[in-house]
Amino acid sequence: MILKSFLLGNLLSLCMKIINSVVVVGLYYGFLTTFSIGPSYLFLLRARVMEEGTEKEVSATTGFITGQLMIFISIYYAPLHLAMGRPYTITVLGLPYLLFHFFWKNHKHFFDYGSTNLNSMRNFSIQSIFLNNFIFQLLNHFVLPSSTLIRLVNISMFRCNNKTLFVISSFVGWLIGHILFMKWVGLILFWIQRNRSIRSNPLIRSNKYLVSELRNFLSRMVNIFLFITCVYYLGRIPSPILTKKLKETSETEEGEENEDETNVEIEKFSEAKETKQEQKGSFAEEDSSLGSEEREDPNKLYGKKRKGYQENWKFEILKDKDLFWFEKPIVTLLFDYKRWDRPLRYIKNDRFANAVRNEMSQYFFHKCPVDGKQKISFTYPPSLSIFFEMIEKHLSLCTTEKLSPEDLYNHWVYTNEKKRCNLNNEFINRIEALNKGSLSMHVLEKRTRLYNDKNEQECLPRMYDPFLNGPYRGTIKKVYSHSILDASTTSTEDSLRVVWINKIDDILPTNYQEFEEKMDPFNGESLSTDINHSLASTSELAGESPMDFRFNLKEGLVLPAEQKQRRFDSENPMKYLKFLFDAITTDTPNYKTIQTKSIGIEEIGKKVPRWSYKLTNDLQQQERENEEESTEDHAIRSRKSKRVVIYTDNDKNPNTPISTNGNQAEEVALIRYSQQSDFRRDLIKGSRRAQRRKTVTWEIFQANVHSPLFLDRIDKTFFFSFDISGTINLAFRNWTEKGSEFKTSNSDEKETKEKEKKREDKKEENERIAIAETWDTIIFAQAIRGIMLVTQSILRKYIVLPSLIIAKNLVRMLLFQFPEWYEDLKEWNREMHVKCTYNGVQLSETEFPKDWLTDGIQIKILFPFCLKPWHRSKLRPHHRDPMKKKGKKDNFCFLTVWGMETELPFGSSRKRPSFFEPILKELEKKIRKAKKKYFLVLSVLKEWFRKVSKEKTRWIRKIVLFIKKIIKEFAKVNSILLFGRKKVYESNENKKDSITIISNKILSEPTIRIRSMDWTNYSLTEKKMKDLADRTTTIRNQIERITKEKRTIFLTPDRNGSPNETSCDDKRSESQKHIWQISKRRSAWFIRKWRYFIKIFSERIYIDIFLCAINIPRVNAQLFFESTKKILDKYIYNDQRKKEGIDETNPNKLISISKKYFSNISNKKSRIYWDLSSLSQAYLFYKLSQTQVINKYRLKSVLQYRDLFLRDRIRDYLGTRGIFDSKFKKLPNSGMGEWKNWLRGHYQYNLSQTRWSRLVSKKWRDRVNQHRTIQNKDYKRDSYEKDQFIHYEKQNDSVVNSLPSQKEKFQKHYRYDLFSYKYINYGVNYGDSKDSYRSPLQVNEDRGIPYNYNTPKSESVFVLGGIALSDYLEEKYIIDRGKSRDKKYLEWKILNFCLRKNIDIEAWTNINKNTKIGTNDYQIIDKKNPFYLTTYQEINPLNPKSFFFGRMGMNQGMLYRPIANLEPWFFSEFVPLYDAYKIKPWIIPIKLLLFNFEGNETISENKNINGNKKGELPISSNQKDYLELENRNQEEKEEFGQGNLGSDTQNQQKDVEKDYAKSDIKKRGKKRQSKSNKGAELQFFLKRYLLFQLRWDDPLNQRMMNNVKVYCLLLRLINPREIAISSIQRGEMRLDVMLIQKDLTLTELIKRGILIIEPVRLSIKWDGQFIMYQTIGISLVHKNKHQTNRRYREKRYVDENYFDGSIAQHGKMLVNRAENDYDLLVPENILSPRRRRELRILISFNSGNRNVVDRNLVFFNGNNVKNFGQFLDEDKHIDTDINKFIQFKLFLWPNYRLEDLACINRYWFDTNNGSRFSMLRIHMYPPRFGIG
């Protein structure tokens, strides 16, 4: 068994080895390549099928295999691969051969196949077959381009070591596959030859020449395929002929450009002390040095001719123009090797105008040391690797053998340990020095600063100091080359400068061509930092052998005699590198001056190669034309556009002096852009297009190309997406709640109609655009269309219409009517054919648009002539005026190509009013009149006949009745016995007769009446209905009477004498009948209503059984509510009497809710159904948490004994929240681990107010301290304000909606998410005054009212507040977009501008208005934070008309991120204001930001302010004039004047006075102000609001464009009055948009709503800091460290400069003041922050325990941390005791900090900065503390 398993294991391992071996992989790959069938197989199969002899077959196969072998060799041999992979290979070799072969084969008599000896190998045809197969195999990328196979090769080559074996095996694999394929083809051909069924086919047998025809057909097919291949390759190759040669930047231009740039740099970097001469020396020839600025590119660097010092320049490549044509290589003759061959975009830098050369890949693989191991970095700087290769070739430094990985790793560990020891020792020494009593200033580690001037000891500005500013780490300015020296310079002083030439010159090799392939010129200075850290210890590479490097002076370098040759030891490689790169030496004092002057700091950036072209686009070209520069055509493609001249000013102004271009007329032109999808924008002209596969465009205007694979991911149009759930909900709602059915249907109908209309309009517009674009794209279409339009216009005006007028008037004369020549000709003259541009801008009747044949034209017909059969006389009354006006509005049209009229260009043709329609109408009228007369006569006659007939019938009836009477009298004489039965019978008969007569009479009369009425003009249907109703009632009455009479007659048998009595049997039968009838009726009714019965029954069962379960907790809830209601009411009543603060009109929200609720519940007869099932516990406690701090002991019993409703956890939760006291008040540790407890203690994370304010969903203190709760009545959406359990109003028959809509669900989830967020962040939001974080600006120590109890929504996570952001963002998680009065909005529409001219903006932002109302707490006013600018305006809920203040107070909009990313050099004077707004954009009051602020001089008098004033601020009642300047001053007085400034009013006042001293502006009168406003407004607007985009609303834009179109026409007319009036009547020209007032101010424009200032669009992107602080916000629950509600301020006892302001903040920590045990100095602050971090990281690395080879080196052993965790476990609530806490903090200081957990900067550990993705390899720390 053991043996078997052993053998089996061996077999498996053997199999795995074989499968993974290079040979097998190669064979597999080779076999796959067989299926890459291309055009090369055409010739091979042709040779086989045509049967031209074995020699040809053999030569074809040999050529084919040789070609494939070449391809496989090219995989291994790089030069061959490069040669074949170039696009020019196809151009130079492939295409000419293809074309030659194609034309040769197509010409039959060009070569004769059979002329030479077949057996000769020299036969040209056999050689050609070989060549065909060989070359075509090389070009085999056709049917399957086999990109997958190429990738496979790359992967396999990367993996396997033995590359030769891989290539051979893959070739063998291909050969096997190829042989199999050819055998398969041979079998198929053999089968065709031998198949009897094919041969027995009569068609084949009868055709003798079938074989020869087949051969001809095959050769023809091969030629067709060959042609297709040629065409295909033509698309792929770069064309050598048709490329657009681009103009290179001339030397002079470049020189000028460089001069400009150097001037900029002088301004930026040089100090004021430097003289002009030194500047010249420092910055003159930057281009000449190798490692120059960003703008340096290979072509400029090596392509520019250097004058006078070519012999010194090692990389010199002469410019092409300096060589003769025969000296240039062939390829550069054919192709411009510096141009764009792929569709590259032109990336332009603002400072350096030439385009970036982006051929280079962003990935560059190279090995680099990472964590002591050599790893492959794929973002390694290529320049660095090239540089290392150069150094290796030139120096003996790196020639020794390299160290093993273990040695390297150990060395790395050793250096880290050494660093740690050094840091530890230094740290301990500093602490010991402190203990000995040294001054702290001497002990603290000082930051190294760069001096600007040693004598004056001025440091560099912080921005440019590399030691202070990370991103701005410095590079030292260039060393200077010979170009600085004049030829005549001989003095030694000048010659000393020559030392500073680029010392790297000498070590670079002279044979530059070796590096040409991967040349990427590097910038020595910028790379110095990279080299310093990448070559961490050059000794690792160089070994320990000492290196003797001699620096030879060449080419006229002068060195002072006293300076000796330098030696470099391997122990100090960095010194060597520094000497290489930096122009710094310490030997001679003479050099120091040069060195200090040449220091300049630059931001590190990626140095990119640039093209030598300076390209322009269309717009820049036009700008240059305006500047009268002669330039070539623009080289960058813009969007397809056409320039349309709309106005040419030919008037010469006599006052203006005659200039050179005075003859040229001034043109006003618009640019018309094509509406097609534009994928060529910003491409360089002549560049090849990318061959897109699997991409389609299916819309008229499509911004991006889409792949059909991802169609399901795209938001589809209406037709593809249909909201099924919405329709189902709609149906169910209508089914269950019938009452609201009609209302909803009406509103829905309206909405659907509007939507339909919009859709139709959109559809029509798209169709029009499509037609316009088709005309635009077809060649010569515009010319054809233009000519046709002009022809149609002439035909219409001068042929068709005059002939119609003549014909009409002739017919009138024939019909003996007056002709209307004058009227018709007047109307015909009025018709104007105005020539318009393609977009419809009107020009004039005679003037054609410029280039109208190419650009297109429209012809607009004003007052289009309409032929009428007659004209109305003017004397007729105008009773149809309104209709006429309606028709007159669209009194113009556009002419179509077919001579029709259309409303809009390219729209559908409109129906013209018919000529014959009024004639026919008139005829109809006359016929109707004649009919009326005729029918009137007829009806009179009929009436007369009817009357006569009536009389006759009456007379006959009377005679008949009289005769019957006589007969009756005779019958009475006879005896009863004899004639009894007969009498009854006769009477019955008579009755019958009489009935029939009566009924006939009744029936006949109405029919006659109806018939007679038919002829009149009454409404026939109404009459018929009436008559039918009368008829039915009369018939019913008759029938009833007859049945009664019959009953009385028939029920008179002998046994019952009296006719009025009935027998018992009859009664019984009658009652049975009656019951039967009732039951029948009832059953029918029951069958009809069965459906509803079942439904009601099921509903009853549902309500009785299922809702019973829901009602059980409701009882408890009711009891709970009643008890809380009593307690709360009592408490509030008491509280109101104690305190004045709470407003009587608005009691607490929860209480008002509960009052409403119980008042409704108590009303038994109320039909409202209260669905308390939606009242969740979470919601209830949310509401409770918003109440004022209630009397907790009263609630205690309720909250303890309602066990069904309240659980222990919730009771504890409420206890911790401070709503009531639990017996054992626990601290809420539910959401936190022990590490968070620890984290709480670190003052570094007691974040600044700004940071916290981003997390906290505050209602910015507007109303809390005024103790008001405003009911939000207007807020109609589903927010927290809408109390769920009130708004459930249902009818009796309705049930709980079984299909809640998606929206409701969404909102429900949203609300609970919000609640859970608040639960986690409750310390931030709602905690009581003792335990919770409170901003120092808003602490109420005495009263325990949480400052934001009136918080309907949290705005810090899901709802983006501020400017109603729904306009700018996707509607993702933003539901509550209705404007709540609690929200602050930035309303840009109604803002005014600050019009002060000369105000210091710092002072403007520095105005501190932190005056709180109603509190006695100290307010911090920090000089360094000028941003706590808050205004206090009460929003009066009883005055909804107060528009300005009613829009949410409007004073603090909430935004969560900076508005834009402007660089500081944009407007320098705007920087402080913008920065302030960027940091805290929601705090600056808008009124202060944008309105005129007149400094209030009286504020200094308000020093003794009564603190007991009411907290409500009055609003100026005159709301209409709130934008007027005078009222603003008054309002601001009120805002400043009222309120309690607390006990430190005077201190605060000083701050305020100080700030106001700067911006103290006296009041001006309105007149003076309005004068100065005009200039100041514009200036102010330009300076401050360019970061906002201006836009007007779309309707206004459209109206403006319409006006412009009319102006264009009016300008050209001699007498424009008539057209102007008519265009105003038509509504084409709008007067409200015209600028009639010339002095209309910006303020007015904004007030009118014409101009809207919008912020630049925001993106939904949380920045990293925000997320980080969110995380901290969750963990830091106890933030009472921030509460500074003592009446004192702790002194800052440490200098801020050395402690980064961190201890200053810490100094405010709440400590027991009785003991002077303030927070001790945290020892880590001795070190600088950078060294601090380094020490912490070194300590936590524990690098000794790592494995070197196999493991991923990112994890480490965390044993050394356990002792801290044990310490933590002892006391979970360590922060409750301050002294303990301080000790705890001191104990833990250096080890574990949040930034160490997340972002270890690998900068100190010699990691190459290029490997950006090493962030993925962050050290994953194990959990510090044993959680759980």
From Swiss-Prot:
Protein keywords: Chloroplast, Membrane, Plastid, Plastid inner membrane, Protein transport, Transmembrane, Transmembrane helix, Transport
Any single GO CC term annotated in Swiss-Prot or TrEMBL for this entry: chloroplast inner membrane
Region (Disordered) residue spans: 270-301, 618-637, 741-763, 1533-1571
Subcellular location: Plastid, Chloroplast inner membrane
Main localization of the protein described in the UniProt heading: plastid
Disulfide bonding pattern of the chain: none
UniProt keyword annotation of Secreted present: no
Top-level division of the source organism's lineage: Eukaryota
Bias type Basic and acidic residues, positions: 270-279, 1550-1562
Membrane association type: Multi-pass membrane protein
Keyword Transmembrane (UniProt): yes
Residue spans crossing the bilayer: 18-38, 64-84, 87-107, 124-144, 172-192, 222-242
InterPro entries (alphabetical): TIC214
GO BP annotations, alphabetical order: protein transport
Any one Pfam family match given in the protein's UniProt record, by short name: Ycf1
Family: Belongs to the TIC214 family.
Subunit description: Part of the Tic complex.
Function comment: Involved in protein precursor import into chloroplasts. May be part of an intermediate translocation complex acting as a protein-conducting channel at the inner envelope.
Protein name: Protein TIC 214
Record organism: Calycanthus floridus var. glaucus (Eastern sweetshrub)
